[in-house]
């Protein structure tokens, strides 16, 4: 199947990676048209959800320190739209250099943004990278410096 850019946003286009948070990157794709072609109408004859896992979620805390975690995003099948995958990745990457604060503030932002984009109430669970319950990850030997108290204002090579 060939998708048109107008119908599916940035899919298939060369894209610049965002340097700051932007919820407008989320590109919804309406479920109704595909369901109508399949003869599926409301009420839906099934239940379900789309589950997205973000294994490399990162953002900055209020002091500018990088934070990392894993996220599970659940979008109900009853939502008006799904989110186009490339736009979802760009949205997640837009968080990387943005001062957000703690993981709860990030979770609230993501719930609001994704719920608005898909037209349904989503759930987001964020797990710290150091406590990946439910995400089978093997840890390497070494010293974790993620919790070191420092203020960071410059993110480039040494001057």
Segments the model singles out, each with a brief description of its role:
Residues 1-159:
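N-terminal intrinsically disordered, cationic/polar leader segments
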């Amino acid at each position: 199947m060939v998708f048109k850019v107008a119908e599916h946003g940035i899919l298939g286009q060369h894209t610049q990676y965002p340097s700051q948070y932007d919820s407008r990157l989320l590109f919804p794709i309406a479920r109704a048209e595909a369901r109508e072609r399949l003869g599926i109408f409301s009420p839906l004859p099934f239940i379900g959800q789309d589950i997205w896992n973000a294994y490399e979620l990162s953002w900055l805390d209020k002091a500018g320190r990088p934070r990392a975690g894993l996220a599970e995003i659940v979008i109900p099948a009853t939502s008006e739209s799904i989110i186009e995958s490339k736009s979802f990745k760009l949205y997640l990457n837009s968080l990387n250099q943005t001062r957000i604060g703690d993981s709860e503030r990030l979770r609230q932002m993501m719930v609001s943004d994704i719920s608005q984009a898909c037209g349904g109430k989503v759930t987001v669970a964020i797990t710290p990278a150091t406590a990946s319950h439910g995400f089978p990850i093997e840890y390497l030997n070494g010293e974790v410096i993620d919790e070191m108290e420092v203020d960071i204002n410059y993110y480039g090579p040494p001057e």
